[in-house]
């Protein structure tokens, strides 16, 4: 899901990609409300993180806020299906990549699998922690900070079990 915009919004009327209303299932009845509330909470968390980046850079705390007035941020509910490790020993749940936005905020289930690449080039697992978020710097923040905050290279390892996560990109 993404920012819910009405059909009469100027960006929707102009036909801008990724702008408009979301498509929602009818059931379960509280699904939409729950996801919309979670999405808004994650947007606020992302805004606070961006304020911290700005303050760390010696800028006004609102420096990055106006760049998120109509965010293209997407909340994705991800499922990485179980793979037969004997047949697919090197198969990744998601290959190495960086995210495009300013900051990605995610939770992962107890299975784990998220790995980040250190500056030295080693892959290290991010252990799941109940009630905690993982925040990865995105590519646009790397550009905005002239590389001071590099985008986080990460991947999802296959542990041979179903894995679930929720990510705001």
Sequence positions of predicted segments:
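Peripheral, non-catalytic segments flanking oxidoreductase cores
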Residues: 1-169
């Amino acid at each position: 899901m993404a920012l819910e915009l009405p059909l009469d919004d100027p960006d929707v009327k102009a036909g801008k990609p990724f702008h408009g209303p979301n498509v929602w299932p009818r059931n379960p009845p509280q699904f939409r409300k729950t996801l919309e509330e979670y999405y808004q909470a994650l947007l606020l968390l992302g805004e606070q993180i961006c304020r911290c980046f700005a303050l760390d850079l010696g800028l006004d705390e609102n420096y990055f806020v106006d760049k998120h007035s109509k965010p293209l941020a997407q909340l994705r509910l991800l499922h990485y299906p179980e793979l037969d490790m004997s047949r697919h020993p090197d198969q990744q749940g998601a290959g190495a990549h960086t995210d495009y936005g300013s900051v990605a905020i995610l939770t992962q289930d107890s299975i784990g699998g998220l790995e980040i690449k250190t500056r030295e080039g080693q892959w290290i697992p991010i252990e799941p922690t109940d009630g905690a978020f993982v925040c990865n710097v995105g590519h646009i923040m790397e550009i905005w900070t002239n590389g001071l905050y590099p985008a986080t290279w990460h991947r999802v390892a296959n542990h041979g079990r179903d894995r679930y996560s929720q990510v705001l990109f």
